[in-house]
From Swiss-Prot:
Biased composition (Polar residues): 298-313, 745-775, 935-949
The organism of origin for this protein: Meyerozyma guilliermondii (strain ATCC 6260 / CBS 566 / DSM 6381 / JCM 1539 / NBRC 10279 / NRRL Y-324)
Region (Disordered) residue spans: 21-42, 57-120, 201-226, 286-338, 525-556, 605-775, 791-820, 935-967
Protein name: Stress response protein NST1
Listed Basic residues bias regions: 99-110
GO CC, one annotated term: cytoplasm
InterPro entries tied to this protein: NST1
Family annotation (Pfam families): NST1
Ranges of compositional bias, category Basic and acidic residues: 605-621, 630-738
Compositionally biased intervals (Low complexity): 207-226, 321-338, 791-809, 958-967
Domain of life: Eukaryota
UniProt keyword annotation of Plastid present: no
Protein location: Cytoplasm
């Protein structure tokens, strides 16, 4: 047997090649086979099992999913669903496109089948199709046409088991209020989808009117499998058009009605409403509307619409009839009520056949009673009072019977089965009493008026095909056509979900949809009776008149009542589906949750087992680890002991080395301390001697100054007395001269030289007191003059204290300090006087010689502080300058031997003579050490030398003033010096120098020579200046990255300080000035070397004066 499942394809089964197992089963007791295979159901009582070979069964399991060796999918056969398990190689998962592949796969699987019931008839002509959702559908092809009017089964809810209904009720009660409201929420789209789904399922269950080939060629992807004939298509179009019109015009009224019906009970009563209770509610609502309408209208006869309910569906179905009276109707008024007889017969039959009936049977009885009552329409001859009375009694009967059924349902759902039977029996007696108390008169007119409805409906059903054929040629009303088209064209929304439900539910759902379509068809037949238009003589005008008369008979209220009832049915079904779907979803979630819990439990059990194994392994590892730890501890203990012994030995050796080092260090420090003490003692001794010498010099200087001051005062007094005497003597002469013409000023000044001399002498003295160079020149000139005159040097001069130029202020207050470049610039002296201008004795000796490059401000003159001419050092062995005093010799004796006074590389006065005259000596003085600027030589010689007896004492400032140099010639000059002078020199120098020479020192000297000289470094220079220069030098070294760990080398800092200060300072004086002073703004930290000498210095600013 060749089969193909997938892609909507189907094949005919004409020759079976397998054996089948066919057993007569019912849908309720049908069970799945114990072994995996294929289960197909065809019809109501035949069950086919396709079993696999035992060898092939090893590769599969009893329960499989799609994509594995087998796949299960729901199937539908003639309106019933089942389950098919398709082996691998068949169905949707098969890729077989040729018979060879299929045969190979069938050989591998070894599929065998056996027939348990050979007498069962096997359908040789059938079609197996695949639905769009993958379902397998088996259809028989024996009959060419399906029956349009198949037997209608009970609804989903009426055939539900007690357990399912109880579960649904419990599920509804467990829902929260928002969830309940969401389930009962009504919208237009949901109801419209229900109608379309109903139409699709109804057409899918009906057969077609053409050959079987057309059915097999229907598309598998279409949403339904309905008939495609022109009659069915037009009918569906009409129905859909009518529904669309109803939605557009009456949707709001319908929704209000549905809400009114739904709100009669609270949400907790919804299960009872869904399981049949809504019949009573709808009927009660309809009766109330009828009574209200009758009270508001007159006594004229009106057309009423009585509900017609099918025998298999719960909701009532509307049916309209004509109000034309017939003779049979008038005769039936006096006859017994057929509804009474029918109800009595139904009750009696029910009690006999169902002594222990279930609730479902009671619901069917209630529907039959309703159907019996709805099939009878009261006649037009009855009065308004009788109709109202009949309606009230009928309403009371239906209400009592509905309450009894609802109470029975509540008892059954709560588990009170015995109480249900008791209540049902009591309810039957109550209904019977109420029914018999009307004496057959309550419902006579109502039932007899409706007696003709059943026969009329039967006739309409028989002529349905003729009406459909006739409706193809006639113009149908737009509303009905649109309603049919809407149900036919729209795609179903629910069928795929319903097909996944159990087979009993799906079958009931399909039957319900068939019933609804039948009701719509009955409405169409009843509203439009085309039999009256079959007469060819019936023209269009008569048709229009009769149609208008019929429409006028049906009031708008009755139409709305029918529409409301129709929509009420759909809303109830919508509620049912929603509740069922929600319940299924909850069941699925619960199962999923339980499955997850089971999986978690299994996983936890596995984890616990693994954890136990891990614990055992951990224990074993821990035991091994403890053993290893013990071994490691023992090994570490031994190593620690070994290290402790080695450490103890090492400490002893270090102590010995430290002790030896300490002893050496103590010895070294002791030596250094002794050395420092000796140095300090020598320094203190020198300082004491220096202080004594300075004190002695100071006293001598003060004494000399006092004598000079007294002599000056005496001279000034004498000068003043002389002036006063001269004034007194000259006053008569002045008076006489005033009478005479005044003489020129030049003559006056020449005539009184004595008056101007004292003033000029005082001016010269004042100038000379400010110009050390002037004093030096006067001293030299006076000394030479005395030497030339052969005067003996004064011995007492050496004992007089000399005033050092170092005691002069660093900078005179009246003028700024001279620039060093200006000081070092050579000075060009004016031309010396000629020999004609000089005295006869001085010609050719001193005058007339050129003066070359004399500058007393050269660096050679002002050397270092230790070699300074202004210090207290001796002048032993020094010469006057780097140049010679003259070409001739002064005598056989020398001044100071061969040592140089101004430099170390200049000729001395030892071998020079004064024969060349005074001019040559002046030239030598003017050329003092200009070429040598190294500052290594000085007039004072090396430091520390004492003054010998024959050395020149320091030249005093006061001794250099005036026109003469008293006592300026030192006593150390040998006595034979004066005798060695040539005679012409002693005779050529006058006793007193000319006035211009006395006032301006030596002739040829520039007037600019009288400016104060820069001193190298006075003894009492400010220490703060040295500190400032030292700090600037430290910052320069720091900016040039010449520091060593933030410290500057002492020697390098000293050299940089000398450059910044532009003065010569000794290293000891530099260190002494930089020592910490609490009043200074700078702080200097010293670092000493191993011998106690300062090696490095760190300079910083003080944060405060008291830091």
């Amino acid at each position: 047997m060749d089969t193909t499942f997938g892609n909507g394809e189907c094949e005919m089964f004409t020759s079976p090649h397998q054996k089948f197992c066919a057993t007569q089963t019912s849908p309720s007791n049908m069970k799945e086979p114990d072994e995996p295979g294929v289960a197909l159901k065809n019809g109501q009582g035949v069950h086919f099992d396709y079993h696999m070979h035992p060898e092939a069964r090893k590769d599969s399991e009893s329960t499989v999913v799609a994509g594995e060796s087998h796949s299960e999918m729901p199937i539908s056969s003639n309106g019933h669903n089942g389950t098919i398990a398709v082996p691998e190689g068949y169905g949707a998962n098969s890729n077989g496109t040729s018979n060879k592949k299929k045969k190979k796969k069938s050989k591998k699987r070894h599929i065998d089948a056996t027939i348990n019931d050979p007498d069962a008839e096997y359908p040789t002509s059938r079609v197996i199709k695949q639905a769009p959702n993958g379902d397998v559908i088996v259809e028989s092809l024996e009959d060419e046409h399906h029956d349009h009017h198949s037997n209608l089964s009970a609804t989903i809810w009426d055939n539900s088991t007690i357990e399912e209904q109880e579960d649904l009720k419990r599920f509804w009660e467990s829902l929260e209020e928002p969830e309940k409201v969401k389930l009962v929420k009504i919208d237009k789209k949901s109801i419209l989808d229900l109608f379309r789904t109903f139409s699709s399922n109804q057409q899918g269950g009906q057969p077609t009117h053409h050959s079987p080939a057309s059915s097999s060629t229907s598309l598998a992807g279409t949403p339904h499998h309905g008939c495609t004939c022109s009659s069915c298509g037009r009918r569906s179009s009409i129905i859909e058009a009518e529904l669309e019109m109803i939605y557009d015009n009456h949707f709001d009224d319908i929704i209000d009605f549905i809400h009114e019906v739904r709100d009669i009970k609270d949400l907790n009563a919804l299960p009872g409403l869904l399981f049949g209770g809504f019949h009573m509610l709808e009927e009660e609502h309809r009766m109330k509307k009828t009574r209200a309408r009758r009270r508001s209208t007159d006594l004229q006869p009106q057309t009423r619409i009585s509900p017609i309910t099918s025998s298999t569906d719960g909701p009532p179905e509307p049916t309209t009839t004509s109000n034309v009276s017939t003779p049979s109707h008038s005769e039936s008024v006096s006859s017994p009520s057929p509804w009474t007889n029918a109800v009595a017969g139904l009750l009696e039959k029910f009690l006999q056949e169902n002594p222990g009936a279930s609730w479902n049977k009671c619901s069917q009885l209630f529907q039959e009673i309703q159907e019996a009552g709805n099939q009878v329409n009261p006649g037009n001859g009855s009065s308004e009072g009788s109709d109202r009375e009949n309606d009230d009694k009928k309403t009371a009967f239906l209400k009592d019977f509905g309450e009894m059924i609802s109470g029975g349902f509540n008892d059954m759902t709560s588990g009170k089965q015995e109480q249900f039977h008791e209540n049902f029996a009591n309810g039957i007696h109550k209904i019977a009493n109420d029914f018999l108390n009307n004496d057959g008169k309550s419902f006579v007119e109502m039932v007899e008026a409706l007696s003709g409805s059943r026969s009329e409906r039967a006739d309409l059903l028989k002529s349905l095909q003729e009406i459909e054929d006739h409706s193809n040629q006639q113009e149908q009303p737009g509303t009905v056509r649109e309603q049919i088209e809407e149900l036919h064209d729209e795609e179903p929304v629910i069928p795929e979900d319903i097909q996944n439900q159990p087979k009993e539910v799906v079958g009931q759902y399909v039957d319900q949809r068939i019933n609804q379509l039948s009701e719509l068809r009955d409405r169409l037949e009843e509203e439009y009776d085309y039999d009256t238009y079959d007469d060819p003589e019936y023209d269009n005008q008569e048709y229009d008149e009769e149609l208008s008369d019929t429409e006028s008979e049906i009031s708008e209220e009755e139409k709305m009542q029918e529409i409301r009832r129709l929509f009420l049915i759909q809303v109830i079904k919508l509620f049912q589906e929603r509740l069922k779907n929600a319940y299924k979803e909850k069941l699925s979630q619960d199962r999923t949750r339980r499955l997850i819990e089971e999986l978690e439990a299994e996983e936890n059990a596995k984890k616990e087992k693994e954890l136990k194994k891990l614990k055992q392994k951990e224990k074993a590892k821990e035991k091994k680890r403890l053993q290893q730890v013990a071994k490691d501890e023992e090994r570490r203990r031994k190593e620690e002991e070994e290290r402790a012994r080695e450490e103890e030995l090492r400490l002893k050796q270090e102590e010995l080395r430290a002790e030896q080092k300490r002893r050496k260090e103590e010895a070294r420090q002791k030596k250094e301390e002794e050395k420092r003490k000796r140095i300090e003692e020598l320094r203190l001794k020198k300082e004491a001697e220096k202080k004594k010498q300075e004190e002695k010099e100071r006293k001598e200087r003060e004494l000399k100054e006092k004598k000079e001051r007294e002599s000056k005062e005496k001279e000034e007094r004498e000068m003043m007395e002389k002036k006063e005497q001269l004034k007194k003597e000259q006053q008569p002469k002045v008076e006489q001269t005033q009478e005479k013409p005044q003489a020129p000023p030049s003559q006056t000044s020449q005539s009184n030289p004595s008056v101007s001399d004292p003033i000029s002498s005082r001016q010269d003295n004042s100038v000379s007191s400010l110009d050390p160079t002037h004093d030096l020149q006067n001293a030299i000139s006076s000394g030479l003059e005395q030497l030339s005159l052969g005067q003996q040097p004064m011995s007492h001069i050496s004992s007089q204290p000399s005033q050092s130029i170092s005691q002069l202020p660093i900078q005179p207050p009246s003028q700024p300090f001279l620039d060093m470049d200006q000081i070092r610039s050579p000075v060009t002296a004016p031309a010396m006087p000629t020999q004609a201008q000089m005295p006869q004795s001085a010609r050719g000796s001193l005058w007339g010689q050129p003066v070359n490059n004399f500058s007393p401000f050269s660096e050679g003159v002002w050397g270092s502080r230790n070699n300074s001419i202004w210090g207290n050092s001796s002048m032993s062995g020094g010469s006057i300058g780097s140049g010679t005093m003259g070409s001739g010799t002064i005598g056989s004796g020398t001044i100071g031997g061969s040592a140089s006074i101004w430099g170390s590389q200049t000729p001395t006065l030892a071998n020079t003579t004064m024969g060349m005259g005074l001019q040559s000596g002046i030239n030598g003085i003017q050329g003092l050490s200009l070429e040598k600027e190294n500052g290594s030589a000085s007039i004072a010689g090396t430091p520390g030398n004492s003054l010998p007896g024959n050395s020149l004492p320091p030249i005093s400032r006061n001794s250099l003033s005036g026109n003469s140099i008293p006592g300026s010639i030192p006593s150390s000059i040998p006595g034979n010096l004066s005798g060695s002078l040539p005679g012409n020199l002693s005779g050529s120098i006058p006793g007193s120098l000319p006035g211009n020479l006395a006032a301006n020192s030596l002739p040829g000297m520039s007037p600019s020579m009288s400016v104060p000289l820069p001193q190298p470094f006075p003894a009492n220079v400010d220490n703060e200046m040295i500190r400032t220069a030292a700090y600037q030098a430290f910052m320069l070294l720091q900016n040039s990255n010449q520091l060593e760990y933030g410290l500057a080398a002492a020697v390098k800092l000293y050299q940089t300080t000398i450059l910044v200060l532009s003065m010569e300072v000794s290293f000891s004086q530099f260190l002494g000035s930089c020592r910490d002073d609490i009043e200074s703004s700078y702080r200097f930290d010293y670092v000493y070397d191993d011998y106690g000498a300062v090696s490095h210095i760190k300079a910083s600013l003080r944060s405060s004066l008291w830091n």
